[in-house]
């Protein structure tokens, strides 16, 4: 009988499960954690998932907004980046806690509490968000390949599909290898922009004042629009699903209160530390935009514009050099590659969680990748590889992210506030109401952004 079941599964490579397996089953509980070690050794064991989540906050889609914010309003919007990062820390900590306490990711929990039809609808919405996120990363990677190697954009877009093979190899080597590779790519981004900001010699006292909120952010319409862009990109819907899943990669006994409590503590520390690094990177991007482009008439609305400007002494002054431009392209490629790894993982989590679809890892990841590459490739062929036209896709991809946001944030706050689900680990009253307030503000801001992007609001 058992052999017949195995044969049946082989014949049906792609199938739907009545009872879904664990979230990211192949790596769930795969990382051992010490039980009686000191603080630093325990933290080292839990460090890793946070960096995978953090890359979503510094992907190519966020770059233009941050640099444009600095170029337009100097250091004034640093306070918006600070507030955005604090919001991200709260929501990502809640996502990790949901996964650790329940052993279910956000997609599985949402599906458990909705009908099959609703599960399918939510999957479509969230899958569109994954595609939107991936589009930004594909475009960023393809443009970086063109800038570095003069590779045609269409070829670069096709090459990005090979990311799937890299991820499959890393999964075979263990989840810690994925964490290490992504951490290395993020370190490259951090070092490149730290170096470029040091060369730009920003005004430090003026820079620090930028972290203090001020009324102009609300009263100045142009400043408000850019602020909305920064805040709107704060919470990436797929990151909440991802965070609730990869927090389960550490091996713990959920029947033991102390182990669960410790896992929540160290996962939260890891998440906050890595999101602090994302905050630093986004700050560096805005500071670079302010130090080099504020007061100039140069356009910094596209990656190619930024690349060219960094080697133009009439725009950035004496520090201009081809090396600065090349470093920018290297960081852009690192950002695109790190984000595609996490985006593909999130695609698997969402597909399995919402519609219980199981297929071989290579097929699932290839499908997720092709769903994102195809629209970009069609767009690139239609516009004959025109970078400006292709980068316009970035703007519209953000609309899908905004639409999907409520479908991630609202369930997250609901489930983590429910004592029947979370027991004593449910949100405290002040956390719950703070989260609801933040969620409401984020949703309103994103709806406003959609209306502006589509031209309904002037």
Curated annotation (Swiss-Prot):
Belongs to the NRAMP family. H(+)-stimulated, divalent metal cation uptake system. One of its GO terms (cellular component) is plasma membrane. Keywords: Cell membrane, Ion transport, Membrane, Symport, Transmembrane, Transmembrane helix, Transport. It is a multi-pass membrane protein. GO terms for molecular function: cadmium ion transmembrane transporter activity; manganese ion transmembrane transporter activity; metal ion binding; symporter activity. The lineage of its organism: Bacteria, Bacillati, Bacillota, Bacilli, Lactobacillales. This is Divalent metal cation transporter MntH. InterPro entries: NRAMP_fam. It is found in: Cell membrane. The chain crosses the membrane at residues 38-58, 76-96, 119-139, 151-171, 180-200, 223-243, 275-295, 315-335, 370-390, 393-413, 437-457.
């Amino acid at each position: 009988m058992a052999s017949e079941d195995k044969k049946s599964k082989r014949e049906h490579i792609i199938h739907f499960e009545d009872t879904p397996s664990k979230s990211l089953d192949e790596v769930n509980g795969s990382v051992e954690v010490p039980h009686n070690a000191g603080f630093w050794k325990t933290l080292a064991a839990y460090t890793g998932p946070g960096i995978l989540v953090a890359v979503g906050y510094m992907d190519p889609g966020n770059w233009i907004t941050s640099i444009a914010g600095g170029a337009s309003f100097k250091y004034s919007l640093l306070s918006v980046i600070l507030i955005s990062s604090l919001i991200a820390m709260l929501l990502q900590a809640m996502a990790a806690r949901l996964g650790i306490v329940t052993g279910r990711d956000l997609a599985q929990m949402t599906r458990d509490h909705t009908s099959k039809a609703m599960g399918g609808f939510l999957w479509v919405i969230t899958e569109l968000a994954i595609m939107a996120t991936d589009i930004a990363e594909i475009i960023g990677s393809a443009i970086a390949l063109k800038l570095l190697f003069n590779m045609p954009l269409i070829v670069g877009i096709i090459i990005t599909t090979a990311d799937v093979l890299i991820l499959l190899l890393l999964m075979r080597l263990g989840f810690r290898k994925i964490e290490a590779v992504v951490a290395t790519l993020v370190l490259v981004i951090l070092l490149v922009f730290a170096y470029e900001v040091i060369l730009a010699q920003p005004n430090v006292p003026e820079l620090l004042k930028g972290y203090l909120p001020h009324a102009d952010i609300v009263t100045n319409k142009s400043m408000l629009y850019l602020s909305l862009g920064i805040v709107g990109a704060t919470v990436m819907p797929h990151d909440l699903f991802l965070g609730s899943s990869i927090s389960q990669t550490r091996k713990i006994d959920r029947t033991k209160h102390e182990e669960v409590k410790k896992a929540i503590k160290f996962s939260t520390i890891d998440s906050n530390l890595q999101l602090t690094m994302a905050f630093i990177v986004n700050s560096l991007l805005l500071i670079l935009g302010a130090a080099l482009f504020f007061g100039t008439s140069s356009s910094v609305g596209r990656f190619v514009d930024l690349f060219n400007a960094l080697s133009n002494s009439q725009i950035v002054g004496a520090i201009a050099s081809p090396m600065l431009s090349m470093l920018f392209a290297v960081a852009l490629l690192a950002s695109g590659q790190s984000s595609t790894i996490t985006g593909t993982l999130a695609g698997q989590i969402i597909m399995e969680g919402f519609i219980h679809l199981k297929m071989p890892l290579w097929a699932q990841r290839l499908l997720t990748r092709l769903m994102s590459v195809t629209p970009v490739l069609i767009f690139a062929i239609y516009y004959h590889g025109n970078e400006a036209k292709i980068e316009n896709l970035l703007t519209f991809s953000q609309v899908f992210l905004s639409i999907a946001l409520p479908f991630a944030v609202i369930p997250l706050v609901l489930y983590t506030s429910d004592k029947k689900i979370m027991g004593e680990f449910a949100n405290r009253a002040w956390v719950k109401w703070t989260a609801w307030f933040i969620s409401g503000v984020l949703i309103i801001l994103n709806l406003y952004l959609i209306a502006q992007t589509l031209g309904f609001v002037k």
